[in-house]
């Protein structure tokens, strides 16, 4: 199954492209040079992991949180004017530990964090936490952050994933950073310099919480069980 996915990724890559298999976090940020930088970084880094002390030594903001180390790496490898689109757990926006506060400060002061897409639960299967997508451009400081609270009007899950239609309004409004019942802007001057808190606080009525129905949860569990059974059957056939 993993080999099949790898083949599909390789077949979809441009002939001029290349793949590098390495542990990104073992690279010291101080060693990254201009020739190592990129114009665009799109990523969904793993979060919830705990990195070893020797790995943390490679970063100016030391933390065991895997996703926070990756975010520092992404900012570093972008060229001036480079664009980033990163999926990260939503608690990054409000955590009060020193690493989270320092990382938000770094992001706001070294990049233009222009968009925060607040995703509903179930958007990314297996994440276990709510997520946001942060869109930024490296170089100029952040002057204004535009938030959009995604609400597809239904519960998301493995059998009912997010689709292009769900994102249509976001794509339309984001072009001009327009305000709406689901979107608003926050002036960087109003962000608390002590915490750099970026919590999603919709001034038009607060955060909508979509509760999944019991049947939806049962259906997803059944689908996951069926998938697990298929994987186990495949493994048995290899033994």
Task: Describe the residue ranges of each PLM region.
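S-adenosyl-L-methionine
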Residues: 1-35
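A conserved structural/catalytic subdomain of Rossmann-like adenosyl-cofactor enzymes
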Residues: 21, 26-239
